[in-house]
């Protein structure tokens, strides 16, 4: 694996520490995809609303991405002395190379493109914080990642071009900023909602898988998921948010018996061809940040 040219600065970080964070990123991706049952998403039970990917694709993809996570951390450390707004430009070639390995591992299937963006940002933020001898906490990591993305939504979503990307179209039609907006804001859905919710459930003694499933429902209820909107429009997104909110209001996922509600929700998502991939990406970040 060749590393794109990124910086001439050297890092003082221990390889073991870098590898430890990279391993957490890999475990976060595996934890999410193996979590079952998940409405509309690939898991151990079925392929959700996806006909082009399976569980094994995600396992291969996560392994391919793990090899690149140290590069994001290293670049974050090596670029610690430059303005944060300039970091994203240097991260892009690493992300593109990582994406290439993902596609090679899955024979062209897009399993984790969103996670390459979000985990890459968080890993770079961790590298920067470590290099500057600053505390590595969920809040500092996400605020540092946000500083890398300052102005990103304006630059990439606000355009008058006739040839719009899917993200630009959803922004113009529905005002959804997707992964870019969440990153630029410092991942508030994770920091202010999903992470405290998940940690509270764990503190209450709830089984970790049930706690993650309940946290996924919370994310589905509040996230303007562009993956869902691109498949089902505004109506599909509002339906999914309402269904998730209804399950939470009924008590959420607290016992194995509650999994029947998720299985029914899964069947309905498959029938409507809806997959909350954006919320799945945020769940990966939630688990990852809970470990640091």
Curated annotation (Swiss-Prot):
An example Gene Ontology molecular-function term: triphosphoribosyl-dephospho-CoA synthase activity
Gene Ontology BP annotations: prosthetic group biosynthetic process
Keyword Transmembrane helix: no
Top EC group: transferase
Keywords: ATP-binding, Nucleotide-binding, Transferase
Catalytic reactions on record: 3'-dephospho-CoA + ATP = 2'-(5''-triphospho-alpha-D-ribosyl)-3'-dephospho-CoA + adenine
Domain of life: Bacteria
UniProt cross-references to InterPro entries, sorted A to Z: CitG (IPR002736), TriPribosyl-deP-CoA_syn_CitG (IPR017551)
Regions annotated as coiled coil: none
Signal sequence, renumbered to the chain: none
Assigned protein family: Belongs to the CitG/MdcB family.
PANTHER family: 2-(5''-TRIPHOSPHORIBOSYL)-3'-DEPHOSPHOCOENZYME-A SYNTHASE, TRIPHOSPHORIBOSYL-DEPHOSPHO-COA SYNTHASE
HAMAP family attached to this UniProt entry: CitG (MF_00397)
Protein name per Swiss-Prot or TrEMBL: Probable 2-(5''-triphosphoribosyl)-3'-dephosphocoenzyme-A synthase
